[in-house]
Amino acid sequence: MKFLLAAALLATLAVYSHDFSVQDTQSRVLLRLEDDWALALIRRDAAVFRRLLADGFIYTEDDRTVSRDDVLHDVVAGLDTVTTAHNEAMRVHRFGATAVVTGWLVVGGHGPNGSFDRRYRFTDTWVSRDARWQIVAAHDYLVPATHR
């Protein structure tokens, strides 16, 4: 009886440890994709954004809501030129085939009004479809310069 109990316990632990390692791997993938986003801002890399943004993607920032096409246009042909971008303090929250990533996006560059340094608090919602992660919704809050 003790042998069966021990075997059942080991089998259960093996299943859970496998689930955790899969989750850890998927979390690392999502963090890398978030970093790909930041790098694509600097490069104005439309191909990366087309790969990352799901059809039907929706983005909100402050008082506006925009579509996938609007985001693609803004990051590739917008008036601002991003020269630095990186993420900080990212956390992945998994819900099966859906994940929410929160963190800080720090962006620097120049635009029509001169140089800028921006800090965004972001919440990105990712869905795994056909063995790849795509972002379906994103919200950014631009921290006012007086609060940085």
Regions found by a protein language model. Name each.
Residues 4, 16-148:
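A beta-strand edge to alpha-helix "cap/lid" segment located at domain peripheries
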Residues 4-12:
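Sec-dependent N-terminal signal peptides
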